[in-house]
């Protein structure tokens, strides 16, 4: 499948939405930003609910909109599924009726695949009034998938659900993109949802793209600083489970070539891919490698950037290079920064307790 190509502009009151993006053809791309940043407006332009002032929209090798060529495909020809914040089910139809609404080419095998993935089979004869919020959203997702879209748009689909219902729906969302091999644009203001679900991240601010790319890259960028206080700053890694230490309940993961980390035991097979979060506050710095220490992870690194927090906080953020294109953030006090005379380019050792990275910080991605 081809990339999703978005080059468009739209005046939104006092805000000018101006986007130039190439998004992956498979996986979940989160659209993140403050209220009013243009997140929902962007996906409404893609869907055809609203029209760009100027620009291009290309999906799966097709042109959906082109102001220069005079192309504007109607909504029903765009092959896009849309899941709203509220499920928008028809109350007088059963779940089966809602799922089949608008389906013009019945495919029993595909219907069975969708209902099985979303665990909808026991609900097919029920009506929306008899469903929980999480069940309604699963039906809405199923209805969108049954249109066999080239792209799935999701506008804060979990925002109206309480935490137990969010936990109910989240595993289904994790499986969607890979199972159906399609791109999903997922609007959210929840950092927890993004951490768990997103492969790719776009940060919008007042209609402009501040940062876009793989989530591990964008998560550590300056674009995310307004949402991450120094106490919450962290690094995301795509890692591979290397081995388990059954005696001590630890798992070793591979972050990069010759970069390994011991963490609390991960319930995953050796060779599994995981996404792992390491909090900057859990990383300490030493100038010399300790010879006797309880800390299980002592990694050679090089300081590549230093950021000072506002003076009242007396903290310093250090960007450490562990290997080419493999970086780790650490937060130290101004006192430690001064006493160790830390400078960009200096070789150091990053220390991370094995118990500081727990099961909640590791997400299985395959």
Curated annotation (Swiss-Prot):
Its EC number is 7.3.2.5. SMART domains: AAA. It is found in: Cell inner membrane. Keywords: ATP-binding, Cell inner membrane, Cell membrane, Membrane, Molybdenum, Nucleotide-binding, Translocase, Transport. Residues 1-231 form the ABC transporter domain. Transmembrane segments: none annotated. One of its GO terms (cellular component) is plasma membrane. One of its GO terms (molecular function) is ATP binding. It catalyses: molybdate(out) + ATP + H2O = molybdate(in) + ADP + phosphate + H(+). ATP binds at residues 33-40. NCBIfam families: modC_ABC, PRK11144.1. The complex is composed of two ATP-binding proteins (ModC), two transmembrane proteins (ModB) and a solute-binding protein (ModA). Belongs to the ABC transporter superfamily. Molybdate importer (TC 3.A.1.8) family. Part of the ABC transporter complex ModABC involved in molybdenum import. Responsible for energy coupling to the transport system. This is Molybdenum import ATP-binding protein ModC. The lineage of its organism: Bacteria, Pseudomonadati, Pseudomonadota, Gammaproteobacteria, Vibrionales.
């Amino acid at each position: 499948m081809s990339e999703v190509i978005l080059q468009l502009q739209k005046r939104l009151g006092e805000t000018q939405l101006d986007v130039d993006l190439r998004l992956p053809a498979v996986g979940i791309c989160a659209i993140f930003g403050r209220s009013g940043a243009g997140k929902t407006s962007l996906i409404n332009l893609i869907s055809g609910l609203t029209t760009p002032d100027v620009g291009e929209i290309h999906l799966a090798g097709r042109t959906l909109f082109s102001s220069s060529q005079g192309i504007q495909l109607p909504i029903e020809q765009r092959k896009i599924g849309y899941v709203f914040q509220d499920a928008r089910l028809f109350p007088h139809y059963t779940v089966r009726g809602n799922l089949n609404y608008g389906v013009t080419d019945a495919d029993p095998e595909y219907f069975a695949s969708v209902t099985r993935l979303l665990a909808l089979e026991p609900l097919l004869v029920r009506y929306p009034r008899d469903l929980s919020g999480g069940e309604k959203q699963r039906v809405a997702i199923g209805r969108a998938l049954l249109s066999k879209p080239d792209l799935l748009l999701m506008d804060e689909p979990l925002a109206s659900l309480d935490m137990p219902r969010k936990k109910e729906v989240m595993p289904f969302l994790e499986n969607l993109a890979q199972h159906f091999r399609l791109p999903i644009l997922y609007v959210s203001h929840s950092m927890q949802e993004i951490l768990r679900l997103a492969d790719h991240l776009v940060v919008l601010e007042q209609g402009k793209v501040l940062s876009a790319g793989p989530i591990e890259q964008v998560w550590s960028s300056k674009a995310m600083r307004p949402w991450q206080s120094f106490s919450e700053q962290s690094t995301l890694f795509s890692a591979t489970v290397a081995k388990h230490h059954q005696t001590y309940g630890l798992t070793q993961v591979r972050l990069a070539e010759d970069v390994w980390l011991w963490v609390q035991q991960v319930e995953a097979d050796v060779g599994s891919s995981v996404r792992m979060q390491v909090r900057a506050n859990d990383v300490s710095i030493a100038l010399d490698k300790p010879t006797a220490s309880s800390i299980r992870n002592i990694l050679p690194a090089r300081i590549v950037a230093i950021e000072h927090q506002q003076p009242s906080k007396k903290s310093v953020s250090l960007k450490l290079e562990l290997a080419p294109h493999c970086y780790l953030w650490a937060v130290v006090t101004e006192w430690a920064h001064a006493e160790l005379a830390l400078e960009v380019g200096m070789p150091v050792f990053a220390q991370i307790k094995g118990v500081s990275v727990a099961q909640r910080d590791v997400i299985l991605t395959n």
